[in-house]
Amino acid sequence: MLPPASPFLPASPFIMSFAAPSYAFATPFQTPAASPIRSLMSYAMRPGSISMAGGYPAQELFDIDGLTTASNQVLARLGACLQYSNIDGQASLRAELARLTAERGLACDPDTELAVTGGSQQALALVSRVMLQPGDHAFIESPAFPNSVQALRYTGATVHPVASGPQGIDVDALDEMAARLKPKIVCVVASFSNPCGATISRQRRLRLLELAVKHRFLIVEDDPYGELRFSGEQVPPIAALAEGEARHWAVYISTMSKTMAPALRIGWLVAPAEVRRRCVGAKAADDMASSAWIQEVVAQYLANGRYQQHVPRIRAAYGARCDALAQALHKYLDGRVAFRKPEGGMFFWVRLNGEADATRLLPYAIEQGIVYVPGKAFYADPQQADLNAMRMSFATMNEGLITQGIERLARALDACEANAPVSVSLAA
């Protein structure tokens, strides 16, 4: 039975329609940034699927006991940790991070050169914001992590990719481009880059510093993976190699996301005092401060010595998984793919031989139950994309699953090369 008609409304129902508003979005946000990596997560989460797509650390390797102990210690003695934090970070954590950074070869003043951030992504965004504006130019190695490219683009600056290979960024190309375009920032992941797994040699890092002084640009080194070295010689951060005037042109960024846990959202930057001071001001406008409680927990964890015990354990686990992926590629795809085994980090950059296209192969791979990220997702300029390439992460799977995943990929490649029907349809 219908309710009685309201005396305040007309007897005949009607529908009001409104045109969608036309918002005056800022130029960098007028076209929402698509994430080809996130778009693959629904396939990666299918039951029975083996995902090499994500850049996540292995959840089973998180040191829950160590973090629980540190958290209980902090809450028992420090109720103030539930208050607001200093904008630049808790003094206890800045001191611990300065010690950790010094162990990596880079000495810094925790009060004037180091600041705590919400992961390394916020650190890059802050440096970009205080250095760049519309009309400026920024360089980034190519291929590169898409979110890093977005952090630069959201400032309104023009972002230029600089070719990168197995030894990292092409310094000769950088020199020529910098002479023409006068960049204010050059961004690199110098150790075990995402997506290529490449490491820049000491000699090339020194050359980067020479070019920074010559062209007066700021080197921003993002170092999420440096602790995860399985083989080869450790290379100091770029800023640690800087001498004289070069010390004014290098910023170091790092994070606890890959070694402790990403949910902590603890990163930090080490920068010349004037750059650091402005980044802290930008952070105040951004989020006021990072969580004091989480900062104190991480500081306590470091002070307890658990970090020094934990990193070798995850390094060994990831090293074994890296070996397993290399062996599986040799066993099941020998002669059909090319790759360089990384000395650390989480990623392989695998190239299909011949005319194979990693994007065309992907639906066949998903159908077989294996997911990766096509290489074109990592190019700031799609016209430069290597269509044969794919990024594969070995971090979140044990050796058995890695082997099974590559066996599936071989079957997918067989089907793709035979132009077999495929049930999976991906959006363009």
Q: What kind of region is each of these model predictions?
A:
Residues 28-119, 126, 303-304, 371, ...:
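N-terminal small-domain helix-loop-helix segment of the aminotransferase-like
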Residues 276, 280, 350-391, 399, ...:
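Conserved C-terminal alpha-helix-loop-beta "cap" of PLP-dependent enzymes
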